[in-house]
Structure formats: C-alpha cells, structure tokens
Amino acid sequence: MSGGKGGKAGSAAKASQSRSAKAGLTFPVGRVHRLLRRGNYAQRIGSGAPVYLTAVLEYLAAEILELAGNAARDNKKTRIIPRHLQLAIRNDDELNKLLGNVTIAQGGVLPNIHQNLLPKKSAKTAKASQEL
C-alpha cells in the first residue's frame, strides 16, 4: 500500500466536517474567522482564535437565553421579549457589569421603590412587631 489513503479499497471519501462540528459548537466558526480577517483587528489571525471566540459567544448567548427564559416563565409567558432579556441581564451581577453600558430597546427598568417612599408602619403594627 504505497501512497494513497489507507483503509478499505474503494471506500467512499470521508465527508468534510465543519470547524464548528469539530469543536462541538453551534455558532459558525468560519463566519467568525471571516469577520476577524475582514475587521482589520490584526494582520494575521491564528487558527484557534476564531474557535475560542465562537465558543465564548455561544456560551454568553446560552447564559443570557437561559436567564431570560427563566424570567419569561416567572411572568407566565412562553415567548422571550426584550423585557425578559433586560430583567435577566440586570439581575445578574456579572452580566450587568459586562453589559452595563448597553441599552436594550423596549427593555424597561428594574422594579425598584425607594425605601423613603414606602408607607410608614403605624404605631399599632410597630408595637405588634416589637412584642414578637
């Protein structure tokens, strides 16, 4: 068997596998690589950089969608809307820090009432709480 591909004679050629499939990712590694090359971020782009960046983007998207899905379920909805994304991001410390300067259209604000604006406890309820 000199030269040629090893294996059974006459077997069909192995189907090509995308870099996303090789890395076990859903997001497109080839597209991210193309965007890195065309974006003039550097003269040369290594072969591992787009795979790593794609994995990071996929992880962030999955994290945000999971939290937004939980927010939608808490509001008894089956469809994620921008409000659910806003609630998910702003209630998570790390995502809020990462996306602190981002404005989400139709996201609204977090429900928050300042302590001074809440009604004061009456004398009757204050005594009852002290006795307990």
UniProtKB/Swiss-Prot annotation:
Gene3D superfamilies: Histone, subunit A. The modification N6-succinyllysine is found at K14, K22. The modification Phosphoserine is found at S129. Keywords: Acetylation, Chromosome, DNA damage, DNA repair, DNA-binding, Isopeptide bond, Methylation, Nucleosome core, Nucleus, Phosphoprotein, Ubl conjugation. CDD domains: HFD_H2A. The modification N6-acetyllysine is found at K5, K8. InterPro entries: Histone-fold, Histone_H2A, Histone_H2A/H2B/H3, Histone_H2A_C, Histone_H2A_CS. Its main location: nucleus. The modification N5-methylglutamine is found at Q106. The record marks K120 as: Not ubiquitinated. It comes from the Eukaryota. The keyword DNA damage applies. The modification N6-malonyllysine is found at K120. It is found in: Nucleus; Chromosome. Phosphorylated to form H2AS128ph (gamma-H2A) in response to DNA double-strand breaks (DSBs) generated by exogenous genotoxic agents and by stalled replication forks. Phosphorylation is dependent on the DNA damage checkpoint kinases MEC1/ATR and TEL1/ATM, spreads on either side of a detected DSB site and may mark the surrounding chromatin for recruitment of proteins required for DNA damage signaling and repair. N-acetylated by NAT4. The modification N-acetylserine is found at S2. In contrast to vertebrates and insects, its C-terminus is not monoubiquitinated. Present with 32100 molecules/cell in log phase SD medium. The [ST]-Q motif constitutes a recognition sequence for kinases from the PI3/PI4-kinase family. This is Histone H2A.2.
